């Protein structure tokens, strides 16, 4: 079966023990690795966690495929590597970028990757690397990332992600997650595409605990969608690229690696529509901590300290009384990389536009720009809806080092600090 343009089917849920077969009876019954698998398939295990993890944390999927993944020649290091591979020195300065220009030459998803910042090389199970992607051509090769799990945030253009377990179609205002090591191909449905990626080197992403919020709210498990089995039975030559410790390596296959006919497990790719996020906010006063906007989190061994949080700032009502309503001025232990999918961000009146990005490192002071601050202080505090917007944040506990390419791109705004320069002192000790 080819991965064509027909409508895609999905399975609903987060962390489920899913199962799917593209041919009836392709899944073995009652065991994982029979002496002879149905249809002459090979059984293969893809482990997303160590064997001895607690059952509640374990992730693995059994694949029943036409050709074992082990059948490949040696990988060779590619001459063309990911842009932004070289990290610059850490900087405490606040950074902001205009949208990166779309490529003029034919560029697929892999060639269009630019690493913006990172805090880990990928050789340890911790940290994150952050990328933007810019593409104008569908991939004719396949890819897998041995360094981490990929969280894709499209900003421009729809993507079809053809994975070993089936296909996902994602558009701006949706996200997709591809497990570490899973092979996939990116097809462009609109000719051009731009977006953001968090490469999670740590524990797999999961839903945050809700605490006193209760048993419902934020991103609900039923709204996450996993693919159903679809396979390619092709004997045409194809390049398979892997990312290993930050570098791209490739080999030539004599078949498609997207040849899984059936599978079962919980280590799966999935998508989520950000418009389904159940936003929580104040109905009295003050601005709650932005952790109430967490969609997914990768925890560390320290309870409550995230390796990475994926946070969104969606459309919502602002009703707080006697309150400075924008996100407050802040100095944060965590490191914040922000992007904007559409609309405007309520703490920035200008300069932060869809496709752009910003980086505020540990203890770098930030907050509303002068214009947003003045408007908020003078605002008539009627109920107000922030609409047609979607900003997001990758927040991580380790300091992010920007790449040299990110600091040298013309998209870097050299005057970012100026947005706070016109903040004036209004202090008057004689008047409360």
Curated annotation (Swiss-Prot):
Residues noted as binding homogentisate in the record, renumbered to the chain: 345, 366
Enzymatic class: oxidoreductase
Catalytic site: 287
General function of this protein: Involved in the catabolism of homogentisate (2,5-dihydroxyphenylacetate or 2,5-OH-PhAc), a central intermediate in the degradation of phenylalanine and tyrosine. Catalyzes the oxidative ring cleavage of the aromatic ring of homogentisate to yield maleylacetoacetate.
Keyword terms of this UniProt record: Dioxygenase, Iron, Metal-binding, Oxidoreductase, Phenylalanine catabolism, Tyrosine catabolism
Catalytic reaction(s) noted: homogentisate + O2 = 4-maleylacetoacetate + H(+)
Residues given in the record as Fe cation binding sites: 330, 336, 366
Domain of life from the UniProt record: Bacteria
Short name of one Pfam family: HgmA_C
Names of the cofactor(s): Fe cation
One GO molecular-function entry: homogentisate 1,2-dioxygenase activity
The family this protein is said to belong to: Belongs to the homogentisate dioxygenase family.
CDD domains named among the record's database cross-references: cupin_HGO_N (cd07000)
Pathway: Amino-acid degradation; L-phenylalanine degradation; acetoacetate and fumarate from L-phenylalanine: step 4/6
Any one cellular-component term (Gene Ontology): cytoplasm
Record-given protein name: Homogentisate 1,2-dioxygenase
NCBIfam families, alphabetized: hmgA
Assigned EC number: 1.13.11.5
HAMAP family: Homogentis_dioxygen
GO biological process: L-phenylalanine catabolic process; tyrosine catabolic process
Subunit (UniProt): Hexamer; dimer of trimers.
